[in-house]
């Protein structure tokens, strides 16, 4: 702290603390929006695959087929 009185030094220190807190909060909010945007983009790509996105494997029986039981239910639980 240079050249000021006690009051000025306290204000300068409080300003630095406030600046660090604001920068930290902005970084946190930025990371939150970044994650939210990436998640939303991935969901939209999977939901609307015909519009240039990817696809969820196994999301449609016509595309990926579906599970067919190989045993009768009674034989699964028989002792």
From Swiss-Prot:
Protein localization: Chlorosome, Chlorosome envelope
InterPro entries tied to this protein: Bchl_c-bd, Bchl_C-bd_sf
Molecular-function GO terms, alphabetical: bacteriochlorophyll binding; metal ion binding
Keywords assigned: Bacteriochlorophyll, Chlorophyll, Chlorosome, Chromophore, Electron transport, Magnesium, Metal-binding, Photosynthesis, Transport
Primary location: other
UniProt-annotated binding residues for a bacteriochlorophyll c: 25
GO biological process: photosynthesis
Gene Ontology cellular component terms for the protein in this record: chlorosome envelope
Protein family: Belongs to the BChl C/E-binding protein family.
Function: Component of the photosynthetic apparatus. The light harvesting B740 complex binds bacteriochlorophyll c.
Name of the protein in its database record: Bacteriochlorophyll c-binding protein
Organism this protein belongs to: Chlorobaculum tepidum (strain ATCC 49652 / DSM 12025 / NBRC 103806 / TLS)
């Amino acid at each position: 702290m240079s050249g000021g009185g006690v009051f000025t030094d306290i204000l300068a220190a409080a300003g630095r603390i406030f600046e660090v807190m604001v920068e930290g909060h902005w970084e946190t909010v930025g990371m939150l929006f970044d994650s939210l945007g990436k998640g939303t983009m991935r969901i939209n790509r999977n939901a609307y695959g015909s519009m240039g996105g990817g696809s969820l494997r196994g999301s449609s029986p016509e595309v990926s087929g579906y599970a067919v039981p190989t045993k009768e239910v009674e034989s699964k639980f028989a002792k």
